Structure formats: C-alpha cells, structure tokens
C-alpha cells in the first residue's frame, strides 16, 4: 500500500532516502568471502579459495532492497555464499525501496531482480501480475517460524508467495524532558501543555493515509470490511467517521499541532528541541535517539476524545516487509534459498540489532525482554495490539489519493464542519470507485 510519504518512507516503513533501481548497482562474486562489495557501479570478485576448491556451478542472482539496507544485504548475501561453497555465487545489487517494488518489478518482470523486498500490501498485486514465484522450498518451516499474521500477508488463496521478516507500524516518540508518561496517554494531555521552547506539542502527517487511517480505526471504522478483503465496503463516512473528521478539524486548527510533519520535519523538530511528541516508526529511531539522548522515549499512540464524550485508543495501520522471488528467475531453487536465508531467524535478529526492525520470527518476537530493551520496538509492540493489518487487495490502490486529498482539505481549511459529511461521502466514493 502506501507509505505514501513514509515509505516513499517505514516503514516507514521507511524508508526515507528512497532511490530507484538503476541509480545504484553493485556486483560481487563470492565462494565464501565476506567482502561486502565495492562502491556503487563497480564490480568486485572475491573467491574465498583457489579455483580447485571453488564451487563448480556458477549462479548469478540479482537482489533489490532499499538504500538503507544495502550494506546489510551485501553482508548477508556473502554469508550465504560462504555457507554454500558447493556453488560459486555472484550477486548484483539494486536500490529499490519496498514501497516501489511493485512498480519497478511490473515494468518488466523478466528484467527485475531474482530476489526483492516489498511491502505486504503489494502481495496480491504482484501475484496477479504473475511476478512472484510460489514458495515451494521449506514452506512448512517458514510458516511455522513466522507469525500467523505475517504469513497471511504473504499468502494468496492459501499459497505462500513470500518470506516475511519485519513487522511494521507506527507509534509515538516523545521528549521526556518535555512530557511525562501521564501527559502522553492522550492527545488532550499532550496538547494542554505549555512548554518553553516548544512550538509543536504533537506532530502527525495528516494527509498521509497510512497514518490518517489510525484515527478512523480508533473510532471503530473499517476499511474494506471486517477483514480488509471486501472492495465494496468502507465506512469512514458513518457517524463515527464524522466524529473523527470533527476531531481532526479541531486538532489541525490548534497552533500547537504539527499537521503536516513528514520524516524530515519530525527529525529536525526533535533535533532543535521545538517538538515534544510525534507519530513515526522504527526507521527514524536512530536519529531521534541521537537527538534526544537521555530524554529519548517512545510509547503506543495516545487516546483521543470524540465529540460524544467517548475516549478511544488511536489505532494504526500495520504491514510487513516481505522478501519475494521473481516468478521468471532462471534459478528458482537458489533464489528461494537466498530469500529464506535473508529472512531467517539470525538475520532478523541482525536487523533488529542494526536497524531496530521488529521481527516476524515467532521465537524472536516472543523474547519480551530483548524486544523491550529497544525502546522503539517496545513501543511498536505496545501499539501492535491496536493495529489493523494493511490489506493487499487491489482496491486499496484507490485509498491513498482520496485520503491525501481529505487531509489536505482539512489542513487548507476547505473541509469544515459544515461540509464535512459531503467531504467524507466523496472520500468513500473515491475509495470504492471501480478500478481503472
């Protein structure tokens, strides 16, 4: 799905710094070396042994992933080659974010990477395009080792088409020198504070559908029905959706609210001390922690009060990072083996330690002490119970633009309480419109 600003950030999914394939590539040959490869655009060959001991069968694989994961991917690929010395593996790396994977792969499936990372909302689109190779190697093991929700997100009609490895949603970072644990329990508590040096008490990307949906979910609204698979249902324009609209209009009008904070504004606000709390994800954990130092804190999203007096917990949209194998790869068994390696327990732990990515591996995720030792991942875990898994049905393509337009109209002041119902009706009508 989206991540409109985030995944083109995470998740965020992240996700910032997105580049397209072609901007950077790197080739490495390896039969056991842990050489991470050369600079972009160059090729290096490393043999790990003499020709007489090198694998006799040569296998070339192209791997795509986001810019921020390139060094990790290269390290993991070289370790895969070292663990499989019976073959000589060469790797070509391309920079493609999870958010852009579907777009780039579907330009020309035959020219796309053998193995690539994608966001779980793209599963159905990629399968329908014939772009994903069905997992036939070690399927039962992969299913058993990863969370049920992540496996469901990587499956279509009971068939597994990918290897989940990161669980993702958003939560709230805050500066604990400016806000207390009690303050951050509710938006009202945050916004009621007068804080020296702070111009923005609470920041949120209002015109970003991935975030915006959290308010509607918190009020009990549903996007594409109870399980997210009915393309004829969206009730954001019902009575409870109307109360969400009212709340957003009032919130955006508050001068202490940052209504259109993308990743760069969130990070700069914490860095210069003008921001007290913001909604974001694990992809920004490192920079925010560096800025806040001992005052670094994170928690689940806050509660908010509807116009009928009811207090509700803000929801969120969750998805997963998945590694897929190209349906047209010339080396399906090797590509599946590599995808499984890149997403195994050890490498999920590596990502957790290096990037603060929350694992889908059941054993790792159930290690509460370890997960909570990372403040951002601990906050993500708190919010997960209030999250709605991002659907991968094709109709979801219709969600992002009207969500953005609705948010922009609230920010611009053209969506008011007097025309709110009409704006919500138009929003839902656009979401449910027949796909072109």
Where are these regions (language model features)?
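C-terminal motif of bacterial Sec signal peptides marking the signal peptidase cleavage site
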Residues: 18-22
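Glycine-centered hinge/linker elements that transmit conformational signals in sensory
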Residues: 230-260
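Conserved N-terminal structural module of periplasmic/extracytoplasmic solute-binding proteins
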Residues: 8-9, 23-122, 305, 311, ...
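Hinge/lid segment of periplasmic solute-binding proteins
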Residues: 42, 120-171, 182, 297-301, ...
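Extracytoplasmic/periplasmic solute-binding protein
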Residues: 161-165, 170, 188-234, 275
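Extracytoplasmic/periplasmic substrate-recognition and gating elements
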Residues: 290-354
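Conserved C-terminal helix/tail region of periplasmic/extracytoplasmic solute-binding proteins
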Residues: 368, 381-436
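A structural signal for short loop-to-beta-strand junctions that line the ligand-binding cleft
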Residues: 106-107, 111-114, 142-176, 200-205, ...
